[in-house]
Amino acid sequence: MIRPLVVLNIVGLTPSMLGQHTPRLSELAGRGFACPLGTVLPAVTCTTQSTLLTGLLPSGHGVVANGWYERELAEVMFWRQSNRLVSGERLYEAAGAAVESESGYTTAKMFWWYNMHAPVDWSVTPRPSYPADGRKVMDSYSQPADLKDRLQSELGVFPLMRFWGPGANIASSRWIADATIKVLEWHRPSLTLAYLPHL
C-alpha cells in the first residue's frame, strides 16, 4: 500500500516560524515531518519549484527565471504555465514508475507552476482569461476540466488578484489550502504537491 505524501511549498517559511503562531502547520509537521531545503540561484518561484521537482539545477531543467525572453517578440513573458517548459524527469513521474506494479498511484498538483498539461491526475493553477474587449477575467485551469467548477461551486472563484501583484495576501493561500483539502478528501492522491504563496 502506498502511504500518501503531501508536499507543501510555502514561500519564506523557515523552521523557526513553526510554533504558537502556526498551530496547524506545526501539528502537520509533527504528525509527519518537515525539513528545511536549500535553494538555487536565482531563488525565485519557478526556478526553485523546477529544481525541487526534477532534482536538477537550472542548467539541467532550463528554468532560469520566472519569465522567458521571447526573441521573436523582443518581450519578456512572465508566468508561463506549460509543463513542457521544464526539462527532466519530475518527482511524480519517477515515483509513479517506481511503484508501477502497485495500481492506483496518483498525483495532485495544486498551484505549482508549469502545471498546464502536466502528466498528473488532478491539477489546478491560476489562468486568467483575456476576452477581446480587453477585460481580465479571473479564472483558473484544471485537469480534469470539471475540477475547477467543482471547487468553485464550494469555495467561490479563486481570488487571483490576491495571488500576485499589489493586492497579494493570504486570501489566495487560504483558497489553495481549502482546495487542496477538498482534493485530498475527494480523491486521496498518493502524492499531493501544494504551493502556498503567502502566510
Map each language-model feature to its residues:
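His/Asp/Glu-rich, glycine-adjacent segments
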Residues: 56-199
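Generic recognition of stable, solvent-exposed alpha-helical segments in well-folded globular domains
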Residues: 8, 13, 20-23, 90, ...
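Short hydrophobic "helix-edge" motifs at membrane interfaces and signal-peptide entry regions
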Residues: 1-2, 134
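Short linear motifs at secondary-structure transitions and domain/linker junctions
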Residues: 11, 25-28, 39-40, 81, ...
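Glycine-/proline-rich flexible loop or hinge segments
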Residues: 6-10, 30-35, 45-48, 67-80
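Functionally constrained cores in energy, signaling, and assembly domains
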Residues: 5, 9, 29-34, 49, ...
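Beta-strand elements within well-structured catalytic alpha/beta cores of enzymes
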Residues: 2-18, 27-28, 52, 95, ...
